[in-house]
Amino acid sequence: MDQYGKLHEDMKEGRVLSAYALDRHGLAAAVAKMAFGNGFGVKIEHNLDPRDFFAPGFGDLVLEVPADKVGSLSITYTVIGEVTADAKFSYGNAEISLEEAVKAWTGTLEKVFKTDSGENDGATAHFVAAQNHEEGTVDENGLFHTNRVYICNHK
């Protein structure tokens, strides 16, 4: 639990931009979902073993940390990659666009779990990356915006 306490302090001090708790799908799925959410790309470290990239990671966390704050983290960590502005996933010689990855991810079970009802009611969902909003405001889509992340620290 000491690591979670340190993580909580790192978050309070602004050294962590975002976090994702791994599950049975491991780093690959976690990093992909984080990228889908923010619209940025990811360059995975060349020395990361592919077996580790796809292995279950129960209890592990992926953190997005500003480059200038990595060395000041108080938790034990391993750098697995970096966020890029090019909207691509890259590892070694392999590269895939974020758009292609999203299509593969959403299209796999499209016949079973439809994401398009075929009806057009005029409403359209869009991926939006990094818009600045005033703290504590609700935008035109009904989304609440905050710069504060709260983590339960009483357990």
Question: Over which residues does each language-model region extend?
Answer:
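Intein/HINT protein-splicing elements and their conserved insertion hotspots or analogous self-processing inserts
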Residues: 1-55, 67-155
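A structural-propensity feature for long, helix-poor, extended segments
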Residues: 57-59
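Short hydrophobic/aromatic beta-strand micro-patches
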Residues: 62-66
